[in-house]
């Protein structure tokens, strides 16, 4: 999993056709407060593993900070994006933590397909994520009427 520095140094100048998804673990502060920071670390680590297992070789997973991740898809057909993001959401939701009875995690995902500068797409994916987080454990794709 790449980190924010990688994103800032290598991906900020990305231009062309690509798809960006922003992922945010739901209720992460509650996990830390209820189960402890080791459980929070386990949640982050296993979520990253589940996401990594669900994406294709060449797609890029970045832990942007805290409980936020970015996914950069190259050559992801627009009509396949929702299905892919839903499979990632389900993979995270189905994680088990036998060492922390009762711990369940979910993720909210906002995605945007774009042709153009990365910065514009980050804003669009962030808007979609905002709408996904309003209900938690959802996947929302950017469209003009989200504004």
Can you say where each PLM-predicted feature lies in the sequence?
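Alpha-helix C-terminal capping segments
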Residues: 7-16, 55, 92, 97-98, ...
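Catalytic/regulatory signature loops of cyclic-dinucleotide turnover enzymes
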Residues: 124-146
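Core hydrophobic beta-sheet residues of small sensory/regulatory alpha/beta domains
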Residues: 20-22, 111, 141
